[in-house]
Each structure stands twice: as structure tokens, then as C-alpha cells.
Amino acid sequence: MTAQIIDGKAIAQSIRTQLREKVTARKEAGQRVPGLAVILVGADPASQVYVGSKRKACEEVGFISRSYDLDTSYTEEALLALIDELNDDPTIDGILVQLPLPAHIEDSKVIERIRPDKDVDGFHPYNVGRLAQRIPVLRSCTPMGIMTLIKSTGVDTYGLDAVVVGASNIVGRPMTLELLLAGCTTTTCHRFTKNLEQKIRQADLVVVAVGKPGFIPGEWIKPGAIVIDVGINRLENGTLVGDVQYDVAAQNASFITPVPGGVGPMTIASLLENTLYAAEQYHD
């Protein structure tokens, strides 16, 4: 068996096309164009690339994108004051603060300062809590994008044994909640997990987000399983690889996401979907 590739790039492009059409329809109806504020503190090269991709995608679908590139020395107090301004700005539907932040700024304080109805990253405790209570509104972008990828396979998720490897606030934990909502029997694995191989070998669906190249050997993948690889790791020779040993895993899986071109584009597409949702549901 050779796995079918889940083409995140193509699915994300389709979502962006639909969003562009909706924005055009809003304009024609005399409605406001959705606005997204993107804040970057410092000059982390990876963050700069991510932020650039998000801004470009915003412009492609016709959103207003407002950029704030702040120096590393920018204080926490000043950043919180900027967020307060944007919270009160009626032209801004979503506020995105690129993580990680410099050491002198507390991530949780910044995330919680963003008004929940403008939290298009889906990180605010209110929005995570809504997901936990099975009434999601603004959902965490990467897990939301992954659910779109899984749905594209046509596989019924109810009753599947799912394993999430990684328990971060950004991917692993909300991913577990999304899979529970989709009817999976879900196991979350982390650095204290024992018998990881045994758990992976039994899984119908595996989502891996640990940031370690080839962390999951391909032979662990159960024949016919769905494999979602969230990792993007750059090797010394410049090659980008995921957290799963792709070549071998692709021989066992029924569906697999490539790296790059799998989960990454969907994270941005979900961010755009959340921004339009915030405009329509909260701010129109």
C-alpha cells in the first residue's frame, strides 16, 4: 500500500479562493472588509517568515492587514497597551501576536489581553474552554486546519483510535479536544509517556507535533492509518522534514500529509477563516 497524499497546499488554496469570493460579496453589499492586525516582537527569522506568509495570505483574500514590527526591547506594558488599542479599534476583527515572544514578555498575559472575539489564533482560555465544552467558536488554527485535512479524506472519524504525540497549548492539547469532538477515542502522548511505540502501532489516526526530525519511525505506523505530520524541521543540508519518517510511513498509511505542503498552509487558511468568522459573528 502506498498512502494517498493529503495536499494541504491545494486545500488551503481552495479555502482562500472561497474567502476571497466572500470578501468580494461583502464589498458589493456595502459591508466592511475584515481587518487583521499582526504583531511581531523581535527579529526571529522563522517568525518573520511565518508573519510574512500570513500578511501575504491576508492581502490575497482581500482583508485589511495591519502590521506592527516591534523591536526586541519593546516592553510588556507597551505591548499590552497596543493590544488594548486594537481591541477597541472597530476596523480590526482579529489580533495575532506571533509567538514565541522575547523572554521579558509573558505569553499568557499577552494572549489573555486579546479580547476573545478578536482572538483569531484561538489561544485565549475562553476559546479553548468553549472547545473543551463542545461549543467551539474561534478554534486554534493548526488543529482546526488538521480537522479540515482529515475531513478531506472522507474517512469517518467516529470510533477511530487516535494518538496525538505532543501536548503543547498550540497544537497537542486543542488537537486532542478536536478529535474528541470528532468522535475519536483519543490518547495524548508526551515526554512522560511509556510504551509510545505500542500506542502508535494501535492507532488508526496519528497526529505528531514534537519538532524532532523523524521522531516516529515509519514502521510503527499501522497499515491503513491516517498520518498527520505537524513538524517542520530544517536539516543541516537545508532539507525540510517532518516528525515522522515519511518514506516508510507512506508505505503503511492510507493517507499522509507531506512536509512541506501539508499542515503549514492549513494553519494560515484557518487563521483567515477565523478572521472572517469574527467579522461576521461578532463585529458586523
From Swiss-Prot:
NADP(+) binds at residues 166-168, 232. One of its GO terms (molecular function) is methylenetetrahydrofolate dehydrogenase (NADP+) activity. Transmembrane segments: none annotated. It catalyses: (6R)-5,10-methylene-5,6,7,8-tetrahydrofolate + NADP(+) = (6R)-5,10-methenyltetrahydrofolate + NADPH; (6R)-5,10-methenyltetrahydrofolate + H2O = (6R)-10-formyltetrahydrofolate + H(+). Pathway: One-carbon metabolism; tetrahydrofolate interconversion. Coiled coil: none annotated. Keywords: Amino-acid biosynthesis, Histidine biosynthesis, Hydrolase, Methionine biosynthesis, Multifunctional enzyme, NADP, One-carbon metabolism, Oxidoreductase, Purine biosynthesis. One of its GO terms (biological process) is tetrahydrofolate interconversion. Its EC number is 1.5.1.5, 3.5.4.9. It comes from the Bacteria. Pfam families: THF_DHG_CYH, THF_DHG_CYH_C. Catalyzes the oxidation of 5,10-methylenetetrahydrofolate to 5,10-methenyltetrahydrofolate and then the hydrolysis of 5,10-methenyltetrahydrofolate to 10-formyltetrahydrofolate. Belongs to the tetrahydrofolate dehydrogenase/cyclohydrolase family. Homodimer. This is Bifunctional protein FolD. It comes from Shewanella sp. (strain ANA-3).
